[in-house]
Amino acid sequence: MVTIRLARHGAKKRPFYQVVVADSRNARNGRFIERVGFFNPIASEKEEGTRLDLDRIAHWVGQGATISDRVAALIKEVNKAA
C-alpha cells in the first residue's frame, strides 16, 4: 500500500521532515517514490515552515494512496492558511 507520510531528517534535536509518497513496507526514512513537500516544525517567523504540492498529493490520493494523520493535519492547515 502506498502512503503519504513524514520522513525525518535534520540534526539531533532539530527535526526537519520531508513529506514523501512511499510504500508502507519501507522504513520511515527509507526508499520513497516521490517527495511532495516539507515541514519544518521549528521554523522562525521569517522562514517558510511548510510547503506541500497539493496537486501531486491529490494525484496520489486518486491513485489510492493513504495519508498519515499528521500529513492530513498539515494539509488542513495549509488549506486554511490559503
Swiss-Prot record:
For this chain's UniProt record, which GO biological process terms are given? cytoplasmic translation; ribosomal small subunit assembly
Q: Which domain of life is it from?
A: Bacteria
Question: What Pfam families does UniProt report for this protein, alphabetically?
Answer: Ribosomal_S16 (PF00886)
Q: What induces or represses its expression, per the UniProt entry?
A: Part of the rpsP-rimM-trmD-rplS operon.
Concerning InterPro entries, the annotation shows: Ribosomal_bS16, Ribosomal_bS16_CS, Ribosomal_bS16_dom_sf
Q: Which GO terms describe its molecular function?
A: DNA endonuclease activity; four-way junction DNA binding; structural constituent of ribosome
Which cysteines pair up through disulfides? They are: none
Keywords attached to this Swiss-Prot or TrEMBL record, sorted alphabetically, are: Endonuclease, Hydrolase, Nuclease, Ribonucleoprotein, Ribosomal protein
Any one GO cellular component localisation term in the record: cytoplasm
Protein family per UniProt = Belongs to the bacterial ribosomal protein bS16 family.
Q: Which HAMAP family does the record associate with it?
A: Ribosomal_bS16
What does the annotation say about its assembly with partners? Answer: Part of the 30S ribosomal subunit.
General function of this protein: In addition to being a ribosomal protein, S16 also has a cation-dependent endonuclease activity. In-frame fusions with the ribosome maturation factor rimM suppress mutations in the latter (probably due to increased rimM expression) and are found in translationally active 70S ribosomes.
- Tell me the protein's name: Small ribosomal subunit protein bS16
Q: Which source organism?
A: Escherichia coli (strain K12)
The gene name reads: rpsP
